[in-house]
Amino acid sequence: MSVLGFDIGNLNCYIGVARQGGIEVITNDYSLHATPACVSFGPKDRSMGVAARQAVTTNIKNTVINFKHLIGRKFSDPVAQRFIPFIPCKVVKLPNDDIGVQVSYLGEPHTFTPEQVLAALLTKLRTIVESQLSDVKKVSDCVLAVPSYFTDVQRRAVLSAIQYAGLNSLRIVNETTAIALAYGIYKQDLPEEDAKSRNVVFLDIGHSSTQASLVAFNRGKLQMVNTSYDLESGGIWFDALIREHFRKEFKTKYGIDAATSPRPWLRLLDECERVKKQMSANQTPIPLNIECFMEDKDVTGKMQRQEFEDLAAPIFNRIKQVLINLFADGVSIKPEEIDEIEIVGGSSRIPMIREIVKDLFGKEPKTTMNQDEAVARGAAMQCAILSPTFRVREFAIKDTQPYRIRLSWNSTGENGGENDVFSPRDEVPFSKLVSLLRSGPFNVEAHYAQPNVVPHNQVHIGSWKVNGARPGADGGNQKVKVKVRVNPDGIFTIASATMYEPRIVEEVPAEAMEVDGDAKTEAPAEPLEPVKKTKLVPVDLEVIESIPVSYDVQKFHNLELQMQESDAREKAKADAKNSLEEYVYEMRDKVSDQYAEFITPAAADEFRSVLTSTEDWLYDEGEDAERDVYEKRLSELKAVGTPVVERYRESETRKPAFDSFDQSIMRVRKAYEDYANGGPTYAHLDSKEMEKVINAIEDKKKWLDEARHKQETRSKTDAPVVFTEEILQNKNVFENVVNPILNKKKPAAPAPPKKEEPQPAAGDQPQSQPGEMDVD
């Protein structure tokens, strides 16, 4: 069973794997821990991860990046509109205000949803795991981390994408919770359960957003006290700020506007990210140089850290506000009660972040956790906790949900009502019962009660129709209990609805207990009459769910499978073409060099001609041939080349094999001569067995001499008459005969006879020792 945690960031993804020795973040096919969150669509296949990101400038119109905040959102959503300009391909509005990315795939226009793009990325991550871990045959179960501020509809969208990719989600864990788990589960010095908690603030400044969490730790448990976030502070916002600065500078200096062309605009963003990172490590001005940027113009600029900090002051203020918001009304812990502050996330390396933390808490922030991998490690640990194949020390997690959820209801001919069933910072997973009086079917709706604090324009969570309620015997209402729940994935649902109907039931009273003595004198008791009682009997009601966005999981899973099959076919074809190309280059060089002695000049000329024509074909008609065509041509070339390679390799290994066999025979012959001359080493051996030894010597020596002579008379361009493998087999047969005989141990020498002690003469009696006394 795979135990995996996926951290899907806006820029990069990380894969955490639980092993017996702990959590490991594995590398991808480019030996990097970070896999870019990038999917590129081409005329023949898809590419994801590093390969897609490296080719983004050459396939910019068909590449999807920075799409994390489009998942589960509508096209008109203000957050989606803020991130769409960072996506180089065309983003379109679909029916129902859904989002689509429009690309050219397999030579035809296609429109994919952000959830489909996420599924493609998850497919790539699964492929990485299966190729990098030999003990994992097929990846199925996983835990995926999402921002703590993701709403109900976004979480459902992520679950759908996981299903599109053919994976099974054990849990969706909040990124803030994953970080806290990665921190706390290994700590040996946490306070005891009944002692004052260790209060830790985690500040995660990622690529597209900033999250903070306040967590109370005790031995064996963590409690999420509060979380806060900001969607306009993070790495991409710093990069965009620097980019805008240079855009204006280049417009004035060179008369070009990078924002008018997608390719230079994206290229400038990448360069600004590099400048930002270098400014974090250097006080000196950092240069920015781009050749042939636009209109064949080279551009140069520079920026110093102080200038960047002045430009980014509004973003730094937003990050500070995120930390302040942790201590909102209702939070009992004060800033002065914070024991530690841990900073993670790629943008936490900016020096000003440390100053903000120090200014607010009066303490230096810590960086004891891996700033890039903390979320993936925590997600993998959560997966290990849920997995039956792992034994993990007990660690209780009390998580919270961030929004106020309100339930409203109605029924035909009756006034409805509403009630807040979950408040911000309520523990999850958790269930509550709402009691209603109903006489017929009714509808229940859930929505976020404070739209201004929810970062999503879809505040309606869902509707549920409850069927089966009916009037009581008196025609009045009956009690109905509706069970509402926020499940471990952070998704709200109505788990059940139960009507409690009064019914008359008969109960036989319990008989009085007999007491010894009385039973003999009293007459037999008459049977007791049943007593009629009214009881509330639970009746399960039908609940029909209707959520704002529905996903056709089977349809999109089948589409993903088709694309995976297409990718696999194209990869197999590319591998076959590469194998043919590599063979042509290798053999063309070696036939004129190290293989030259092992092929006749005429055959070599003909072979080189075929190799050259194959190379020409590869770059002409064979540029896009089928896999079996490449394999057939390679097979035809190997029919000529393999015997040449075989002759070369045999010439390299045959002589050492002959020499080794010769030495083995000489060693055994020397042992036999020692035996024949009466030497002590083999004197204990049986003559019949030693006859087997000398026969084996003569037989194999004869074979060896004949084989060597036959081979020496052959030309190097002829096929070998004896192969190295045959020599080694004969050597093994020989040694299996002689070694057991020669290695027999000498029998143990007989023990020396015991020396007999003289017996006393008859009549001699031993003298009694003084002090001894005979007693009758």
From Swiss-Prot:
Keyword Transport tagged: no
PROSITE patterns named in the record: HSP70_2, HSP70_3
UniProt keyword RNA-binding present: no
Gene knockout outcome: RNAi-mediated knockdown in a sod-1 mutant background results in increased aggregation of denatured proteins in neurons.
Single GO molecular function: ATP binding
Top-level taxon: Eukaryota
Region of interest (Disordered), residue spans: 741-776
Entry keyword set: ATP-binding, Nucleotide-binding
GO biological process entries: determination of adult lifespan; protein folding; response to topologically incorrect protein
InterPro entries: ATPase_NBD, Heat_shock_70_CS, HSP70_C_sf, HSP70_peptide-bd_sf, Hsp_70_fam
GO cellular component: cytosol; nucleus
Family stated for the protein in its record: Belongs to the heat shock protein 70 family.
Official protein name in the record: Heat shock protein 110
Species this protein is from: Caenorhabditis elegans
